[in-house]
Amino acid sequence: GLGLMCWHIASESKIEPYIVQVTSNGQVITGMQAKSFDSSTIPQSAIEGVLYKFILYARGVAGDPDVDQDDIYAAQALTTGDAFTTLSDYYQQNNPLVIGKSQKVNIQVQYEIPRTANTYEIAWQETTTTPGDQPVSQKNFIADITYEIGDVKDIRYNPLGIYITNINWTQQI
């Protein structure tokens, strides 16, 4: 009777997770029930935003080693497979921490155009300056970037699990 009913109620209980934001001294600021995450509901604008930010992170140089290191981590967290290799090869030839000692590179994305279900064409301009913002060069680039939605591995840098799988970028002459 009663024992069976208590067991049934206990076995039916569900824990509902909450996301809670706290101050540095532990005081709760906000809290909300965590919803299940369905990657098929990621809006196209969010994907475009991630690809836009990737170009800024991967190609820009702030001239501040802390910012540049954070941008390197952010760009790497958005890549996997061939794209990770392409990015690593690029950084071996164009290390933002070395470049940033004598130059800054500002990125201006000009457009993002979907080409296939998971590939975008992105064009941008790179303006290289001295640390005092004197122009050094201006170059235009274009890339085909392919992405996929996967499991979230890095909540800080890639909370949506949007991974760039292939990068083909070239300078426009």
Model-derived features: where do they sit?
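Short, aromatic-enriched amphipathic alpha-helices that serve as compact interaction elements
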Residues: 46-71
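Structured, amphipathic secondary-structure segments that form assembly/contact surfaces
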Residues: 1-45, 66-173
